[in-house]
A protein has these predicted regions:
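Conserved anion-binding
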Residues: 12-15, 20-23, 93-119
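Hydrophobic transmembrane alpha-helix bundles
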Residues: 47, 85-94, 118-119
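Catalytic beta/alpha-barrel core
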Residues: 47-50, 76-84, 98-109
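Short secondary-structure transition/capping segments
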Residues: 59-62, 89-91, 112-115
């Protein structure tokens, strides 16, 4: 079994939204890299990251936090939120992310999504 703990990023912090409402957030940590390290020390081998600002803006917004997380841990990390074009995909993979999660762009542009999957 694979278990992927998740870190939702909003304004560079680790948060949870109540029922997806950006106005009702709970901040769990102001240091996402430290939280990722805690997950690794507890035995996690994988990490799921969600850029909530990126999901709203249509482009990744928490890149400093993502860079810090990838540098701080020795785990496969995946990211979703605001990934809408090939240049973004390439730059995120260059950061050291193992996987990317595409939702909106995959649904709205299935031909493009197929092309990206076949690269």
């Amino acid at each position: 079994m694979q278990i992927w703990p998740a870190i939702d990023l909003l304004g560079g912090k680790c948060v949870r939204l109540q029922q997806g409402d950006y106005a009702r957030e709970t901040v769990y940590s102001a240091d996402p890299a430290a939280m990722a390290g805690d997950f690794q020390r507890q035995g996690a081998r994988y990490l799921h990251l969600v850029d909530l600002d990126g999901a709203r803006a249509g482009r990744p917004m928490n890149l400093d936090a993502v860079r810090a997380i990838v540098a701080a841990v020795d785990m496969d990390c995946e990211l979703g939120g605001g990934i809408r074009d090939e240049a973004t995909i390439e730059s995120l993979l260059e950061l050291g992310l193992s996987r990317l999660v595409l939702g909106t762009s995959a649904l709205k542009r299935p031909e493009w999504f197929r092309e990206m999957c076949n690269k």
